Swiss-Prot record:
GO biological process, one term: endoplasmic reticulum membrane organization
InterPro entries listed in its UniProt record: Ice2
The protein, known as: Uncharacterized protein C23C11.01
Superkingdom to which the source organism belongs: Eukaryota
Subcellular location: Membrane
Annotated TM spans: 62-82, 88-108, 112-132, 154-174, 192-212, 224-244, 247-267, 312-332, 335-355, 363-383, 399-419
Pfam family, one: ICE2
Disulfide bond residue pairs: none
Classification of source organism: Eukaryota, Fungi, Dikarya, Ascomycota, Taphrinomycotina
GO cellular component assignments: cortical endoplasmic reticulum; endoplasmic reticulum; endoplasmic reticulum membrane; perinuclear endoplasmic reticulum
Keyword Plastid: no
Keywords, alphabetical: Membrane, Transmembrane, Transmembrane helix
Length: 441
């Protein structure tokens, strides 16, 4: 009887594993398999718990993003209504607050930091009200004026650093995306080539649209010279890279898009629109019947919602209009590429294609200091947009704090580094020097 049961067990093992070597299996091996069975059954629970924690972490990040968008709007209100001094005082107070919470986290006082995070929305609104009401009176105070002036000078002198970091981060992201496209085609399926060509055509179309929009602005002679030089350089480098096999269409189109973006931002931030050059008839974006239906739907929703909530929505929409679209676009692009670099560099060090999303209790320096960096970057962009000519008597300080000059310097250095990398890379290489640590095998 035992022999029959044992033979049946062997038959089951053979049918499951499909290996004749298991015919010589003894009872000790079967006991080991039985002992490991509960561990295998417990893995789905662990996976569910891990996915649940990741979902909660992503939800928390979305809440943090929404809260920071509110801060962006409030800082724009401070600069628009209260003026330069009011905006500087508010951003300096926010910088001190976020830096204090970062120090609390670094020194292990996370409970106090979490308590401050819980009251962040209330504290931000209180700081805005205090800055709007008290800025006219404290502007005459020499200590407050000195702090605001020092904060303004520090932000303006960070302009070269922010622009150069943006250029280097953009180059690394472009090369990582180009390498990822090659990896998908070589290791997954050649059908990915269709999506790569589609993305490249979209990038080129967006670049041409941005350059077309530039024609509505008056362009100075130095800017016209830099536009022609940068566009000619990126076209020559892209043709050389694609023809030699050292770059692909994805990289070439993204580099062209980066130069077109730089040209557009320089002209929109520092150029005067020439409205007489383009006179276009105004058309409705949607047919009249659809517009009427949408208007009726919005009227119904506004009548249903409480009046207070409706007023809050109107206030937020009106406040969001105080933020210039070019400032918001530049801020979103700069933060996106810098954040992408924080995900790409660990992936390069670990020789993997991408870094899995995770948020542990022991946060890194980037996640702790990110609010301080975001406030500094955004305030720097606002100062560049609202006050493009820094009030410095020294020519050296004017050059150091000129965003227009450093945008061009960043673009030219990025193209130069990309050209050097293409020139010294081998034709058989499927990755670039900056991304050569990725594995294709």
């Amino acid at each position: 009887m035992d022999q029959e049961i044992r033979s049946n067990n062997y038959d089951i093992s053979v049918s499951t594993v499909e290996d004749t070597s298991f015919e010589a299996m003894d009872d000790s091996i079967l006991e080991i398999i039985d002992d490991e069975a509960p561990e295998i059954q417990g893995k789905p629970k662990a996976n569910i718990s891990t996915h649940f924690r990741n979902m909660l972490a992503m939800f928390g990040n979305f809440l943090s993003l929404g809260f920071f968008l509110v801060i962006i709007v409030l800082v724009g209100i401070a600069f628009e209504i209260g003026g330069r001094f009011c905006g500087l005082i508010l951003t300096l107070a926010l910088e001190v607050y976020f830096f204090s919470t970062a120090l609390l986290k670094l020194f292990g006082l996370r409970k106090i930091a979490l308590t401050l995070h819980f009251f962040e929305p209330l504290l931000v609104f209180i700081l805005l009200i205090i800055a709007l009401n008290a800025s006219p009176s404290i502007e005459q105070n020499k200590y407050a004026s000195f702090l605001a002036s020092a904060w303004n000078t520090a932000l303006l002198h960070f302009t070269p650093l922010f622009n150069l970091l943006e250029g280097m981060a953009s180059l690394l992201v472009v090369q990582a995306l180009g390498h990822l496209s090659r990896w998908l085609v070589h290791n997954k399926s050649e059908n990915w080539m269709f999506f790569i060509l589609l993305n490249a055509s979209s990038a080129i179309s967006m670049s041409l649209y941005l350059l077309y929009r530039v024609s509505s602005f008056s362009i100075s002679n130095p800017n016209a010279l830099m536009i022609g030089f940068s566009l000619a350089t990126v076209i020559v480098i892209s043709i050389y890279g694609v023809a030699s096999g050292r770059a692909n269409l994805s990289e070439a189109s993204l580099m062209f898009l980066y130069i077109a973006y730089t040209v557009y931002m320089v002209c929109t931030d520092f150029g005067n629109p020439n409205t007489s050059s383009l006179e276009k008839p105004k058309f409705d974006y949607l047919p009249p019947n659809i517009l009427q239906s949408v208007h009726y739907l919005i009227s119904t929703i506004s009548a249903t919602l409480p009046r207070t909530l409706y007023n809050i929505v109107l206030f937020m929409v009106a406040a969001a209009k105080t933020v210039a679209p070019s400032v918001f676009a530049t801020f979103a692009f700069r933060i996106s590429v810098m954040y992408a670099v924080t995900r790409i560099l660990p992936a390069i060090q670990n020789n993997i294609i991408f870094l899995e999303y995770s948020r542990t209790s022991k946060q890194g320096m980037w996640s702790i200091l990110s609010p301080c960096i975001l406030i500094a970057v955004y305030t720097n962009l606002l100062l560049q947009h609202l006050y493009p000519t820094p009030s410095f008597t020294s020519p050296v300080n004017q050059i150091l704090c000129s965003a227009e000059i450093w945008r061009w310097v960043s673009a030219i250095l990025t193209l130069l580094l990309y050209a050097i990398e293409l020139a010294y890379s081998k034709e058989s290489d499927t990755g670039q020097a900056l991304a050569s640590h990725f594995k294709l095998d």
